[in-house]
């Protein structure tokens, strides 16, 4: 299922998941797709391993948490997701030093809370880990202090930004 990228999403400088200047971070790039899916591209490095050749489960959980949480921004750009609950199911080992796609989408959305689901996809399209999560909606000013920290929140264009994602049919929006 080929889905067009609608826009690239912002990143911070110091965030562990998306931080462009975080030497220990994942440097994940996030994209909103035409069907409302939030998609992320990441190549996890060997210093994020658990067992040799495998990404640490906590790193996988962080990727899923951030991607599902960002799915709220598709329908509510000014709302931010604070994790209330996250449940992860590990299906296959996640290798490092290979490009991975992480996807997330909102399932339910009300005034204060939203829930979503996500998956880490291996290069062959198989799901390596899946997650469901519940999030409380917050204003950015209530959860982050960009001004006094010197942090920024902006889009960092990249020559390799994709025009589309080819996702497995199992990720098709369920009606």
Over which residues does each language-model region extend?
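A short mixed-secondary-structure module that forms the rim of ligand-binding clefts
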Residues: 42-68
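Short, flexible micro-motifs
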Residues: 22, 60-61, 72, 107
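Residues that recognize and position ribonucleotide moieties
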Residues: 31, 53, 126
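HotDog/MaoC-like acyl-thioester-processing domains
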Residues: 1-6, 95-96, 107-175
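Residue-level recognition of well-ordered beta-strand positions that form the cores
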Residues: 41-43, 87-89, 103-105, 119, ...
């Amino acid at each position: 299922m080929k889905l067009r990228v609608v826009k690239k999403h912002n990143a911070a400088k110091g965030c562990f998941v998306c931080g462009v200047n975080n030497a220990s971070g994942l440097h994940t790039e996030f994209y909103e797709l035409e069907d409302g899916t939030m998609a992320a591209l990441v190549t996890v490095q060997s210093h994020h391993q658990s067992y040799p050749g495998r990404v640490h489960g906590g790193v996988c959980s962080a990727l899923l948490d951030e991607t599902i949480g960002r799915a709220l921004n598709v329908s509510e750009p000014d709302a931010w997701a604070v994790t209330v609950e996250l449940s992860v199911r590990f299906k296959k080992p996640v290798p490092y030093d290979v490009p991975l796609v992480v996807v997330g989408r909102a399932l339910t959305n009300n005034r204060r809370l939203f829930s979503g689901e996500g998956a880490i996809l291996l290069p062959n399209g198989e799901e390596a880990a899946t997650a469901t999560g519940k999030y409380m909606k917050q204003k950015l000013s209530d959860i982050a202090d960009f001004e006094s920290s010197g942090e920024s929140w902006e889009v960092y264009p990249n020559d390799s930004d994709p025009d589309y994602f080819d996702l497995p049919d199992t990720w098709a929006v369920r009606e």
